[in-house]
Amino acid sequence: MFVTAAYAQSSTTEGAEAHDAAAAGEVHTETGVAHEADHGAGVFPPFDTTHFASQLLWLAITFGLFYLLMSKVIIPRIGGILETRHDRIAQDLDEASRLKGEADAAIAAYEQELAGARAKGHSIADTAREAAKAKAKADRDGVEAGLAKKIAAAEARIADIKSKALADVGAIAEETATAVVKQLIGGTVTKAEIAAAFKASAGN
């Protein structure tokens, strides 16, 4: 409706201008002077006040269409893009937070397992050390017991050998004494007398 009214107004204005121009042309034809020479150079159309109404109308229509385009298409699309990016960033942050939590939990579990392994290693080392000490003590006790038995057996054998040697020495001494007496006095002496003499000398 506005376009029709403006167009009608513009047509009426242009018709009036044409009529005036024709009348002026007739006058100027009669006087022999050009129309443009009387009024000067023509006005730049955008600055012509006779076209302000239609220009304002088209400006309002253009602004309205641009506003509708911005509000219905461009701004919602930009808002959707921004919202999508915001959601994606939020999801990435949530994923990063979740991964960080999992990494922290894994590190804590690893440190706990490492501490348990160290404690177990120390316990095994202590147990092995105590077992080695016990085994060494048992081996040492066994060796000492064996040595004690061997020493006792050796001492018994030495005592037996010593007693036998002493017995042999006594017999040899008796035989030697008998031979010496026989050589000295020319008589014979019995073993009993020699033994009695040895016992008497041993008692003194």
Swiss-Prot record:
Question: What phylogenetic lineage does the species belong to?
Answer: Bacteria, Pseudomonadati, Pseudomonadota, Alphaproteobacteria, Hyphomicrobiales
Give the chief site where it resides. membrane
Q: What is this protein called?
A: ATP synthase subunit b 2
Which PANTHER family does the record cross-reference, listed alphabetically?
Answer: ATP SYNTHASE SUBUNIT B, ATP SYNTHASE SUBUNIT B', CHLOROPLASTIC
Subunit relationships: F-type ATPases have 2 components, F(1) - the catalytic core - and F(0) - the membrane proton channel. F(1) has five subunits: alpha(3), beta(3), gamma(1), delta(1), epsilon(1). F(0) has three main subunits: a(1), b(2) and c(10-14). The alpha and beta chains form an alternating ring which encloses part of the gamma chain. F(1) is attached to F(0) by a central stalk formed by the gamma and epsilon chains, while a peripheral stalk is formed by the delta and b chains.
| InterPro entries assigned to the protein according to its UniProt record, in alphabetical order | ATP_synth_b/b'su_bac/chlpt, ATP_synthase_B_chain
Segments traversing the membrane: 56-76
Q: Where in the cell is it found?
A: Cell inner membrane
The record gives the membrane topology as:
Single-pass membrane protein
Q: Which residues form the signal peptide?
A: none
Cross-referenced HAMAP family, in alphabetical order? ATP_synth_b_bprime (MF_01398)
Q: Where is this region: Disordered?
A: 8-28
